[in-house]
Each structure stands twice: as C-alpha cells, then as structure tokens.
Amino acid sequence: MLTQRQDNILHQIIHNYTNLGKPIGSKTLMEEGIAASSATIRNEMKTLEEYGLLVKPHSSSGRIPSLKGYRYYVDYLLEPEKLKKSEVDVMQQSLGKDFHEINDIIEQSAKILSKLTSYTALSIGPDVSNRKLTGFKMVPLNNRQVIAIIVTDKGNVENQVFSIPKSVDSEDLEKMVRIINDKLIGEPLLIVYQRLGTEIPMILHKYFQTTEGILDLFNNMLSEAFEEKIFVGGQMNLLNSDQIQNIDQFKSMLFMENSKQLNELLSTKDQPIQIRIGSELGNDLLSDMSLIQANYEIKDHGNGTIALLGSASMPYSKMLSLLDVFRQELAETLDDYYRSIDSFG
C-alpha cells in the first residue's frame, strides 16, 4: 500500500489527466492542494513510477498513469462523482419515450448511453428463454416472397424475408402456418424449439407432401429469438481514443462486429458494477482500453447488462456514477414496459 501523500498524488494525477489529457507535473499538483514542496512531490512521483503506477513520457517532465496505476486507483481511490440533476433529467427524458418492442428499448439504450458519454456502449436485454410464443405469421411481399414474423408474450419480435419454394403454393403455406400456431401458441420458446425438432415435422408431413424450407425458416427464426443480442452504440467513438496509434487499435472496430467475442467480453456478471482494464479484457485489441459493466435485474424477467468501452484514461468517477444511474433508469423503463404488456395479457 502507498502512503497517504502518495495516494493523494496518484489520485490527483489521474483525476487531472483523465480530464485534461496532458502529463501532470509537480506545479499542477501543488496548485491542486498537495501540501509538499515541488522537490518532494517530484521524488514521490519518481517512487510511484518505480512502483509501476506512473509513466514518464519522453517529451515531458510530468507523469501519466499506467494501466497498473488505473487499477490501483479503481480498487482503492475511486469515489463516484455526484451527477447533476440536469444529467439525470436527460437520461429520464431519453428513456421515457414510447417504445413498441423490447429490443427497441435495448438498442436505444446503447445509443443513448453512447451519446451521453462519447464512448462506445454495449447493451444486452433480459433473458428471453422463458418467453412464450404468441404468434407466427407470414405476410406476402410479392408472388414468391413473404416476411415471416414471430412474436412473444413480452414483446420480442423476430422477422425474416423468405422466398417461397416453387413446390409450395400459398394455400399450403397458410395451412402450415395455421397448424404451427394451433400446436405451439402459448408454449415457452424452449418447448417450441424442442417440439419443432420432434413432433411438428411429423404432423406437417401428414398433410403436405413437402415442407421444404418452412421448418428451416421457423427454426432459424427461433434461434434468432433465443440468441442473446448485444446492441452497440457509438462504435465510431473507438476512433476518438487517444490510445489509438496503430492499425491494431483500428481492428477493435471489427471486434464490435463479432457477437461471439462481445458475448465473451460481457460474460462476467457476478457483480452489480465492475471495471476491467487492459489485459483483464482478455483481448489484445483492447489492451489499452477499459470496460465499465453494470448489471440490472427486472423482477420476474431476468437480468440485463449495460456497459461502456473506451480508453483506459476515461474519467472513471464520472462514468461510474453515470452508468450506475443509467442502469437503474433503464431497469425502470423495462419494468414499466413489461407491466404494460402484462396488463394487456
């Protein structure tokens, strides 16, 4: 552990650097209230550098935090910053709009959070495996194409454009949809998924010579409904990072397109709020970045996740507070949505 003065110096260097983006010297620290001479402060900064908590850029006499320094700060010195009422009001107004579908809320939450912070935001909605199927229909687009739609009891909607095989006429298609609805409406998606691989094909084959493509379509759409969707807001904000200095950092943009990697990134959900820095993110493309992840719970509807990804030099005290309040506001918005859905059920 550090001495009280070393704690104060490290705290002030990180606080100033995350806000100004410039190396911090002894003069600035004296102006910030560090009660010591310039020589003493420089000696303490040198000690912190030897501990691996600070780095001295070649072109400056000041110091900047290292990833290890940020980790120490987060673990021992970080104090959440109180948000202004106007900032909370903006959140509430942004999340208080009318939403018609659950995924719309989750997607918009990522965009709203990104706009509020100027960082990249990631959002995952509550678990959908306990949702029930309330409708499957096909709407004609032209002679050979339809849009297939699956709806659940909690407002999840999946749709996909489908070309009708020549061996299937429109009348047979309507009958197939009717049978699927008769047998599966009201069932949990997990049961629907299981029955789709067992008795439903047998039932359809009793009535039709071919079910070419229809069952595959329904199966694919259910897989989409089951998949934990991660919505990304402000992806281009990754390019605004001061840490981006070579082509490897630009590859982090492609990382945002890989849902499997994003799921792995957000797989740790054992704490309400957590901060991971650099190598803790488990991906070389994010080695100079930090992730602040907040989990929330919707009673009877499972858990969701909202997160911020950005430079390791982000202002943690402000971002931590903002994310904490945002997750509560998002949970309230989702709870209101579910209650409105339940009231119609």
Curated annotation (Swiss-Prot):
Protein name per Swiss-Prot or TrEMBL: Heat-inducible transcription repressor HrcA
Entry annotated with the keyword Transcription: yes
Gene3D superfamilies per record: 3.30.450.40, Heat-inducible transcription repressor hrca homolog, domain 3, Winged helix-like DNA-binding domain superfamily/Winged helix DNA-binding domain
Cross-referenced Pfam families: HrcA, HrcA_DNA-bdg
Disulfide-bonded cysteines: none
Gene Ontology terms for molecular function: DNA binding
Tagged with keyword Transcription regulation: yes
Family: Belongs to the HrcA family.
Domain of life: Bacteria
Described purpose of this protein according to its UniProt entry: Negative regulator of class I heat shock genes (grpE-dnaK-dnaJ and groELS operons). Prevents heat-shock induction of these operons.
InterPro entries: GAF-like_dom_sf, HrcA, HrcA_C, WH-like_DNA-bd_sf, WH_DNA-bd_sf, WHTH_HrcA_DNA-bd, WHTH_transcript_rep_HrcA_IDD
Keywords: Repressor, Stress response, Transcription, Transcription regulation
GO biological process: one example: negative regulation of DNA-templated transcription
